[in-house]
Amino acid sequence: MFEFFAGGTTIFGGNFSEQQGGFVFGFATEQGIRAFAKPNGTDTIHIESEDFGSFDIEIGDTEPRAEEAETFSALVRGIMNCFIESGNIFGGFDAKISSEIPSGSGISVTVPFEILIGKIISGLFFENSVPALRLAQFGQIAESDFFGRPCGISEQLISALGGNVLLDFSDPEIPKFEKIDFDFSKSGYTAALVDCKEVFSEDFSEILKDLGFVAWNMGHNSLSEADEAEFIAQFPILRQKCGERAVFRALDFFEESRRAKEEAEALQNGDFCEFLRIYEESGKTKLKFIPEEKAAEFAEETEKQGFGLMFVL
């Protein structure tokens, strides 16, 4: 038996920046998904899990299945398909999988699950030689095309790389990444996972639409193609064309992409207080872009749980 692990992910700065070619800064949590796996000498992948169910996938049966939408078997099939499409030949394996990520924590379980399956195949059959970027790309394809939930690649990359990671999406086809060396345990703080009820999914998708609409009205494919000064100069016209909410969200894109870099720089310099200041600033701006009724619901939860303080003494 061989042990494998993929951490959950959270974003410190640069929310929604990926889709517009900006910067993202996040980290892989110590809580994630763990597996014990071994080759079984067959053409069957056998998954056994109390958290994700037990099922078998036949190697070579790579077509997406409608009935598997939003299931973990779809993710395994998707990862398997990516390896095979890349010309990689491998055998079946048995894996016992368990999750350490609390339900309702706001941290995706699909992302570390995808990366975990990729790590198992890479580790058992290819001497752990598959690069993190390739594993992340496989995860993105599995989630978008097999699981049925379109997504970016930020979280997959962070989970695959581990630790604190600054991502640069100026070239979306080949994102750049930099590992930031900082030990949070030595800061006197810890990152706490709390139940945030996951109440904002639909509202977050609207943010992406707003950002894309502003970029289109500026004649660009993404906001990163525009200079911030150009955006400010066109602000009055864009406000008329796109609406107030969209243009202020676009303004936050420029600020948030910059914050991601500043947060990473603060930790590189060992300035945790400056990192916290920027992180808090980022959180406050997000509240301004949540609809009133959702903001009230969020405020009620944070009052009960102190959710606004992710970092606690």
Label each PLM-derived region with a short phrase:
Residues 1-22, 69, 73-184, 197, ...:
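Gly/Ser-rich oxyanion-binding loop with an adjacent helix/lid
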Residues 29, 80, 118, 212-215:
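Short, amphipathic alpha-helical segments that act as regulatory/interfacial helices
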Residues 1-13, 34-74, 82-85, 89, ...:
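C-terminal nucleotide
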Residues 22-41, 161:
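Structural signature of FAD isoalloxazine-binding scaffolds in flavoprotein oxidoreductases
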Residues 17-19, 27-29, 257:
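A short catalytic or substrate-binding loop motif that flags glycine-/basic-rich loops and adjacent residues
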